[in-house]
Structure formats: structure tokens, C-alpha cells
């Protein structure tokens, strides 16, 4: 068993892209934990729109000035990564009951592999319950208005990626 500090939390995800829901959860997590490592997953069964470097950069820019955080890529098993980083907690967000079953299974598997690493769930702020990176990308790909659902830098990158001009002041 490795040495871990329960005051350091890992918040993992693909963040393809980071949404205001993610940012809100990280801000709230900063009120609970001394430090949060925003761990951007490199190994994902999904086909990301943005490269790992783009996702890390967008998250770093969007979260600048938000508490004590580090944004970095990770590969491999999450619990192994958490242990290497000295984190005693994996932070996860829940939007709906449908999220819970999957997240509960992951938490149990992680606990089986590394009993000393806990999973803590935070409910998503009600303003962001309906958004996900997948829904954001679907709307943006069709020119939908996603302003206010993602950080400004992410908004610009999505508009550029899909070839739509973005309003500078709207």
C-alpha cells in the first residue's frame, strides 16, 4: 500500500471538452480538498475531438486562478495514477441517477484494486445537470449556441474546430 494524502484528490475525465459543469465541480472540490489534480485521460475508448495536448491546454486556460489545481495528462489505471500522485481520493461528479450505477461500479472496482483510495461523489450543480461534453459537441457541430455552457476559451476552440465564426461580444 502506498502513502496517500486524503487532502489531495484526482478529478479524472476525458474533458473533450471541459464544460462549465466540470469547472463548477472543480471549484467546489477546491473548497473540500487541499489540492486537485485534474487528470486528463489519454487512454479512452472514445475518439476525442481534441488531442490530449489540446484538452490539457484548454483545461489549464479555463481553470487558471481556480484554487490549488494541477492539470495533466494520465495513462493507465486511474488508481495506480492516483497512488503515484499521492492522492487518497478520486473525485467524481454525478448528474443523474443514470450516472450513479456506472460510477458506483467503477468506484467498487477501484476500491477492490486499491483499498486505501476512496471515491467521493459530488452532485453536479443544478444549472449544469443537462450538459455533457458529448451534447456540447453535438450542438456545436451543427452551429448551435453553446455560449455560457463552456468556458470562453473552449467556446472559441469548438467554434474554430467546427468551422463556425464566433461572435466576439455575444
Curated annotation (Swiss-Prot):
Q: Provide the binding site for ATP.
A: 14-15, 22, 93-95, 103, 128-134
Assigned keywords, A-Z: ATP-binding, Coenzyme A biosynthesis, Cytoplasm, Magnesium, Nucleotide-binding, Nucleotidyltransferase, Transferase
What Gene3D superfamilies does its record include? HUPs
Compartment list = Cytoplasm
> Per the UniProt record, which EC number(s) apply here?
2.7.7.3
Record GO cellular component, one term: cytoplasm
Top EC class of this enzyme: transferase
Identify the main location: cytoplasm
Give the reactions, separated by semicolons, that this protein catalyses: (R)-4'-phosphopantetheine + ATP + H(+) = 3'-dephospho-CoA + diphosphate
Give the GO molecular function terms. ATP binding; pantetheine-phosphate adenylyltransferase activity
| Residues under site feature: Transition state stabilizer | 22
InterPro entries noted in UniProt: Cyt_trans-like (IPR004821), PPAT (IPR001980), Rossmann-like_a/b/a_fold (IPR014729)
Q: Kindly list the positions annotated as binding substrate.
A: 14, 46, 78, 92
- Does Magnesium appear among the keywords? yes
Q: Which metal ions or organic cofactors does this protein require, according to UniProt?
A: Mg(2+)
- Single Gene Ontology BP annotation: coenzyme A biosynthetic process
Q: In which pathway does it act?
A: Cofactor biosynthesis; coenzyme A biosynthesis; CoA from (R)-pantothenate: step 4/5
- HAMAP family per record: PPAT_bact (MF_00151)
**Function (record text):** Reversibly transfers an adenylyl group from ATP to 4'-phosphopantetheine, yielding dephospho-CoA (dPCoA) and pyrophosphate.
| Subunit structure of this chain's protein | Homohexamer.
Q: Which family does it belong to?
A: Belongs to the bacterial CoaD family.
Q: What is this protein called?
A: Phosphopantetheine adenylyltransferase
This protein's species is Oleidesulfovibrio alaskensis (strain ATCC BAA-1058 / DSM 17464 / G20) (Desulfovibrio alaskensis)
Amino acid at each position: 500500500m502506498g502513502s496517500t494524502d486524503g487532502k489531495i484528490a484526482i478529478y479524472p475525465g476525458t474533458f473533450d471538452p471541459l464544460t462549465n459543469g466540470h469547472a463548477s465541480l472543480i471549484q467546489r472540490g477546491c473548497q473540500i480538498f487541499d489540492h486537485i489534480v485534474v487528470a486528463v485521460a489519454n487512454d479512452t475508448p472514445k475518439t476525442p475531438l481534441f488531442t490530449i495536448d489540446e484538452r490539457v491546454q484548454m483545461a489549464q486556460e479555463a481553470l487558471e486562478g481556480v484554487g490549488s489545481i494541477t492539470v495533466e495528462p494520465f495513462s493507465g489505471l486511474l488508481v495506480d495514477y492516483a497512488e503515484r500522485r499521492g492522492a487518497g481520493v478520486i473525485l467524481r461528479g454525478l448528474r443523474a441517477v443514470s450516472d450513479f450505477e456506472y460510477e458506483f461500479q467503477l468506484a467498487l472496482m477501484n476500491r477492490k484494486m486499491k483499498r486505501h483510495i476512496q471515491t467521493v461523489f459530488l452532485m453536479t450543480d443544478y444549472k449544469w445537470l443537462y450538459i455533457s461534453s458529448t451534447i456540447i459537441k453535438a450542438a456545436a457541430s451543427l452551429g448551435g449556441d453553446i455560449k455560457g455552457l463552456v468556458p470562453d476559451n473552449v467556446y472559441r476552440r469548438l467554434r474554430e474546430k467546427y468551422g463556425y465564426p464566433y461572435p466576439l461580444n455575444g
